[in-house]
């Protein structure tokens, strides 16, 4: 819980209930008393997302958000990002994983630091509930 509240501590605006809501939105409210080493890699990744959510961002930059996750946790993280997008946040995902890339509405391919091409597509898989 304190991990999620870190930004609040910096701004002297501690709100435990808001942090619990952020954890609930990523499916981890029941794990709020666990230390980081007591969480799986997927749970730790979702705590990072909850920490970002507490600031109510309109833009989220997710650098390899599913790196080193199993398929189940990868799907959970992608679904969380989809829900954030559907609620009005702009999500920019940086990834080398083509499986993750196909989830995007728009894909920008870079080669040697320059835009090589851009593709638009429709989302094909259903959203899972956390």
Model region roles, listed by residue range:
Residues 35-45:
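Conserved ABC ATPase signature
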Residues 56:
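Conserved catalytic motifs of ABC-family nucleotide-binding domains
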Residues 49:
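Hydrophobic anchor residue at the start of the ABC signature
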Residues 60-63:
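Catalytic Walker B motif of ABC-type/P-loop ATPase nucleotide-binding domains
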Residues 71-73:
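Helix N-cap at the start of a conserved alpha-helix in ABC-type nucleotide-binding domains
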Residues 80-93:
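Conserved catalytic loops of ABC-family nucleotide-binding domains
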Residues 5, 14-31:
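Conserved ABC ATPase "signature" region
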């Amino acid at each position: 819980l304190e991990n999620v509240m870190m930004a609040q501590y910096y701004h002297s605006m501690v709100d435990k209930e808001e942090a619990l809501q952020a954890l609930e939105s990523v499916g981890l409210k029941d794990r709020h008393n666990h230390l980081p080493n007591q969480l799986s890699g997927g749970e730790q990744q979702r705590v990072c997302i909850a920490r970002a959510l507490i600031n109510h961002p309109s833009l989220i930059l997710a650098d390899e958000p599913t790196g080193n996750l199993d398929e189940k946790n990868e799907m959970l993280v992608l679904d969380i990002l989809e829900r954030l997008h559907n609620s009005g946040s702009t999500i920019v995902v940086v990834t080398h994983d083509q499986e993750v890339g196909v989830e995007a509405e728009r894909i920008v391919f870079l080669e040697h630091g320059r835009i090589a091409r851009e593709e638009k597509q429709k989302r094909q898989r259903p959203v899972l509930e956390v």
